[in-house]
Amino acid sequence: MPGENCVIIGAGGLGHIAIQCMKAMCAANIIVVEKAKAPLEHAMELGADHGVLIDGNEIEKVKELTKGKGAEAVIDFVGEKGSTPMGIKMTKATGTFYIVGYGEEIRVLAIDMIDQEKSIVGSLVGTWAELYELMELADKGLVKLSMKEYKLEEANKALHDLNDGKIKGRAVLVP
């Protein structure tokens, strides 16, 4: 909805696609939170309204961008290294935190969730209808996959580049 905010944590393999889908399908203000500059710059090129670099002040920056409230929706494509508690704190009262990335334990005080009426939703894959909708957006040129190819013997370099935030989008190993 116009005037609402959506935070996307992680602008990598899935996050960069989500930015484009959100831009094509809704009028929400898109705030991307990223640990590395290259993916954050790429997110801005893809249409994100705001970019926030993880530097220890990211929660305050998101609160500032959302007039002190937090976002109606926060989608965490990372799911590790503290992104989950960070994302829950960025979610406004009555908002929803969507967890897509996995690897981290979710620990929250029940009273915080109850008092603020926040929701947590896990998402592994979409429906066939959603996949069809994504393919239509791609066919119209509204969603494009960003990727960097590596030879199979460069797998370690690909992992290092991913970890260092040097890749815009997906890393793909080819034989």
Describe the predicted segments one by one:
Residues 1-56, 61:
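Mid-domain Rossmann-like dinucleotide-binding core that forms the NAD(H)/NADP(H) cofactor-binding site
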Residues 11, 37, 73, 85-89, ...:
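C-terminal hydrophobic helical "lid"/dimerization subdomain
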Residues 12-16, 81-82, 104:
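Residue-level detector of alpha-helix initiation sites
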Residues 35-36, 103, 126:
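Residues in the short beta-alpha loop(s) of Rossmann-like NAD(P)-binding domains
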Residues 62-71:
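A short acidic, Gly/Pro-enriched loop at the edge of an enzyme's catalytic core
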Residues 72-75, 98:
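N-terminal Rossmann-like NAD(P) cofactor-binding module of classical short-chain dehydrogenase/reductase
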Residues 91-93:
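Helix-to-beta-strand junctions that scaffold the AdoMet/dcAdoMet cofactor pocket
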Residues 96-98, 108-148:
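Rossmann-fold dehydrogenase core element
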